[in-house]
Amino acid sequence: MPEVAVLRIGHRPERDQRVTTHVGLAARALGARGMYLAADDPGVALSITDVASRWGGDFFIENDVKWRRCIQDWKAAGGKVAHLTMYGLRMTDVIDDIRTEERVLVVVGAEKVPGDIYGLADYNVSVTTQPHSEISSLALFLDHLFEGKELNREYPDAKIRIEPTKVGKKTVER
């Protein structure tokens, strides 16, 4: 399976904090190694880092990256770029090819995505051809990419973990 990171572009600090935080949390929970945030919003970065420190894993977040440079650096290091959009090739048609890559940077937009992204991406991936959220696109993409294996991942360094129960809620704290 590839090493995966997410590049969040178009984040508007005055408007998108909750959604961008959820992009990072979904990325972490569903198998990505980290997130690059193409905006300066240390509050979002802190929220995601706080969750990762309590719930385990080595998820990273880099705040205020330049999106074009991030893509160029990723590709220069041999990685591939998958841009999630309504307008790309159907995810079900390309996911097997993407799964064979060693490193994948998943680009998730907020507001209108710069047109250059389509040309810079190795894969423009349509997670349905209908409008829906970037969070659902990312979640579906990662689940298909990792074939559901991320759903039962456990983090040995977690300070908090959920113990599955038929009824009620049970957490274990270390």
Swiss-Prot record:
User: Does the keyword Phosphoprotein feature in the UniProt annotation?
Assistant: no
Per UniProt, subcellular location reads as: Cytoplasm
Entry protein name: tRNA (cytidine(56)-2'-O)-methyltransferase
For this UniProt record, the keywords arranged alphabetically read as follows: Cytoplasm, Methyltransferase, S-adenosyl-L-methionine, Transferase, tRNA processing
Say which species the protein is native to. Methanoculleus marisnigri (strain ATCC 35101 / DSM 1498 / JR1)
Q: Which family does it belong to?
A: Belongs to the aTrm56 family.
Name the job this protein performs.
Specifically catalyzes the AdoMet-dependent 2'-O-ribose methylation of cytidine at position 56 in tRNAs.
- Disulphide bridges, residue numbers: none
Assembly description: Homodimer.
One molecular function GO term is: tRNA (cytidine(56)-2'-O)-methyltransferase activity
Tell me the leader sequence span.
none
Catalytic activity, per the record?
cytidine(56) in tRNA + S-adenosyl-L-methionine = 2'-O-methylcytidine(56) in tRNA + S-adenosyl-L-homocysteine + H(+)
Q: Quick one: a GO cellular component term?
A: cytoplasm
Q: From which domain of life does this come?
A: Archaea
One biological-process term from Gene Ontology?
tRNA nucleoside ribose methylation
Binding residues for S-adenosyl-L-methionine: 84, 109-113
Catalytic activity, EC: 2.1.1.206
